Amino acid sequence: MRILSILAQKPSSTGSGIYLTELLRNFHLMEEEQAVVFGLASGEELPVFSGVKSYPVWYESENLPFSVLGMSDEMPYKSTRYKDLTESMLEQFRTAFLTACRKAVEEFQPDLLLCHHLYLLTAMVREAFPDKMIYGFCHNTDLRQMEKHGLCRDYIIKKMQALNRIYTPKEAQKEAVIRIYGVDPARIFNIAIGYNAERFHIPKEKQFFRDGIPRRREILLPNGEKVEKGESTDLLFAGKLGEKKGIFSLLRAAGKLAEEGRKIRLFLAGDNGNQKEKEAVYALAESATYPIYFLGRLEQEVLAGFYQFSDIFVLPSFFDAVPLTALEALASGNKVVLSTLDGLEAFFQEHCPTAPVFFAELPKMVHQDEMRKEDLPFFEENIQDAILSAMEYPYQKMADVSSLSWGSLCHKIVDNTAL
């Protein structure tokens, strides 16, 4: 099969970017022929995907003179918000991406187009290629964009209804797609997500044992400093260093644990394109009474080492689907703390019921991803309690998450009978 994948963002740094990259890698292992259209900022190095023909679209260029469009209002890199697009910017976006897509379709002659995000570019592609088989992937941030502002709303809804198939990570997103876009439920399939089993696994050498699950004995920080395992419980956060990923609440909750005499260290992997918010994170961390290590944005192979070193992965997001990082952490032997996002507990109960996942209850949110200031203490106490439960849990036997592999997911896409 000849498959053309399409993404308006960078093929890295975010969940959808990693999702795209892993599909490309696994379709290549399946010997499918592939091409890909994606966005990059001017001057960035062109990524190389083995066996895949690339059609990059350059932002911050003469034809597209603004930063990469982001499906979140705050991206881990410099970005433009969809709600800030003017008519001229919208036309520049349409022209730049459809030019690349038309070139890819003409040269590559795909049998199937895979469009990431049920949003603007996917709508444009559906309109431009009415006779092509097009599948759309919901990554949850598209739902948030549709509910937060009205950019091309009716146009997007109409074109999403015309997609041949839509994939959602879990039932909560399927229900939202039906509600927001009015799509026929028979064309929506819960496909879960996957993780890279070759990269994310328990350490195989230089092991350290606290419970029954081996941990990595030591790790090198980006600055070259070596950190060794000891008495402290090592917490890891990987994601955008922003409020809506729960970073401020995590810092305060961890501080309360330290005040109670719990020995902890916190490792923060990620960045924030919003400099003001990033500085606020660093400012709050300066007052911490426990060690905090800022790791910056890490390549996947480097992040894998920190999963193997840490004991508990914590991601108290205000809004998300199924975080890829949570699966990677579980596969690497971590206990995991997440917020009670819609349908998330049911997802883990269905796919890996023995996984050591602990939940911090979210209060009622405003506009899907905003928390009232008066609700923060409640949420942070819940994070503290969930981390404490994870710390006290005797993890003796690795949970099996092998069914959630990218290879399995790719076979489902190609083989319709698997759905």
Where are these regions (language model features)?
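Short alpha-helical donor nucleotide-sugar binding micro-motif in glycosyltransferases
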Residues: R297-L298, G305-S310
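A charged, aromatic-enriched C-terminal amphipathic alpha-helix characteristic of glycosyltransferases
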Residues: G15, M371-A418
